[in-house]
């Protein structure tokens, strides 16, 4: 090999080595260093333990069981044949249940945020600080709908966390959790933001932050930090099939939690806006049926009588596209936005009605403590049949209309083979709208059914056990 060629190979080899060193250095620079963040934030993170006294139903040796709930014949038999030992009065025997979670201090005078499920039904709450000192905590208030609880401990100049803005959090951003999984105090785990605005079953009013940060029992109520050392969420739930962490963790946005805590501190309870509607997702077929370019918004399936939406002119079949300038991409976006308003505040809605856009201004009400009872349907009279749909229907009675808050509609009497059977309709279902037209009677229903288009998505509003939803179907040639 000639010397020039050898020099060329050596030069190339050196260049490759230098490139590898540069890439390694860049990779090391790209990985965040959490040490200063943890040192700064840890002192304000606390361990929360609770105690709850529960009735102990177990029977001590030699003790007469409680026979109070037995029928007289059996009670007399046991009293005659069992040794006569003193019976402990009902409720005297107790056992103690304990739970463990995390929290963080948000004010130097001792206010602490955690999850409602960490302290629910507790008789005693102990907050343990980073220096291992323990303080008795008072429950200021809880909000089960968001799973937020506010505690108060007696103290001065306590370390506090910095609060961030969860709205500014971006998907892909690094985040870090500090908590007490399985009782291991001040354990640190990290990950990234996987998604924002997640809605979980039975948690309508929280747009959860989804992360892949390792969260386990005991982490609940602890803080989720961004890389600035600011709290952006409260770790609350995980999705799991095994009972342990599977890479899907959910945190309550700190903006939501602080709004709740401020109301709990001021009023001891939380008030939310309420429209008084039942909504559903807009899928591809419904979008076509209602004249939308693509699936988007929240479809109004039911408007509660005398509710804010009814008074403001919102109608069944309207599709809500935005509220106060915020787009409604999915139906689950609407409850978050409405819930953030106070009683009497305005909700500016952009809707589509009969294929045309328009705006409505509605004054929201206060969310009731319990869901309104919207009644159930029963069978009516004046039966008619639609061979095109394969269904027989009858008029609703006056009582049924009042119970369901309907001006008209029909109840299904019989379902034959055909489109109705294919989409799952069954006797007792109530149909209030067909092809975006309100139904006044069984006669109107059959007339509308005769004019339904073929090979195009057709919508039908159905109430089953009082709950309304839109479904779609297509009639073949």
Curated annotation (Swiss-Prot):
<dbReference type="Pfam" id="PF13365">
    <property type="entry name" value="Trypsin_2"/>
</dbReference>
<dbReference type="InterPro" id="IPR001478">
    <property type="entry name" value="PDZ"/>
</dbReference>
<dbReference type="GO" id="GO:0042597">
    <property type="term" value="C:periplasmic space"/>
</dbReference>
<feature type="active site" description="Charge relay system">
    <location>
        <position position="220"/>
    </location>
</feature>
<keyword id="KW-0677">Repeat</keyword>
<keyword id="KW-0574">Periplasm</keyword>
<keyword id="KW-0732">Signal</keyword>
<dbReference type="InterPro" id="IPR011782">
    <property type="entry name" value="Pept_S1C_Do"/>
</dbReference>
<dbReference type="Pfam" id="PF13180">
    <property type="entry name" value="PDZ_2"/>
</dbReference>
<dbReference type="GO" id="GO:0006508">
    <property type="term" value="P:proteolysis"/>
</dbReference>
<feature type="active site" description="Charge relay system">
    <location>
        <position position="147"/>
    </location>
</feature>
<dbReference type="InterPro" id="IPR009003">
    <property type="entry name" value="Peptidase_S1_PA"/>
</dbReference>
<keyword id="KW-0346">Stress response</keyword>
<dbReference type="InterPro" id="IPR001940">
    <property type="entry name" value="Peptidase_S1C"/>
</dbReference>
<keyword id="KW-0645">Protease</keyword>
<feature type="binding site">
    <location>
        <begin position="275"/>
        <end position="279"/>
    </location>
    <ligand>
        <name>substrate</name>
    </ligand>
</feature>
<feature type="signal peptide">
    <location>
        <begin position="1"/>
        <end position="27"/>
    </location>
</feature>
<dbReference type="InterPro" id="IPR036034">
    <property type="entry name" value="PDZ_sf"/>
</dbReference>
<keyword id="KW-0720">Serine protease</keyword>
<feature type="domain" description="PDZ 2">
    <location>
        <begin position="361"/>
        <end position="466"/>
    </location>
</feature>
<feature type="binding site">
    <location>
        <begin position="218"/>
        <end position="220"/>
    </location>
    <ligand>
        <name>substrate</name>
    </ligand>
</feature>
<feature type="active site" description="Charge relay system">
    <location>
        <position position="117"/>
    </location>
</feature>
<comment type="similarity">
    <text>Belongs to the peptidase S1C family.</text>
</comment>
<dbReference type="GO" id="GO:0004252">
    <property type="term" value="F:serine-type endopeptidase activity"/>
</dbReference>
<keyword id="KW-0378">Hydrolase</keyword>
<protein>
    <recommendedName>
        <fullName>Probable periplasmic serine endoprotease DegP-like</fullName>
        <ecNumber>3.4.21.107</ecNumber>
    </recommendedName>
</protein>
<comment type="function">
    <text>Might be efficient in the degradation of transiently denatured and unfolded proteins which accumulate in the periplasm following stress conditions.</text>
</comment>
<feature type="domain" description="PDZ 1">
    <location>
        <begin position="264"/>
        <end position="355"/>
    </location>
</feature>
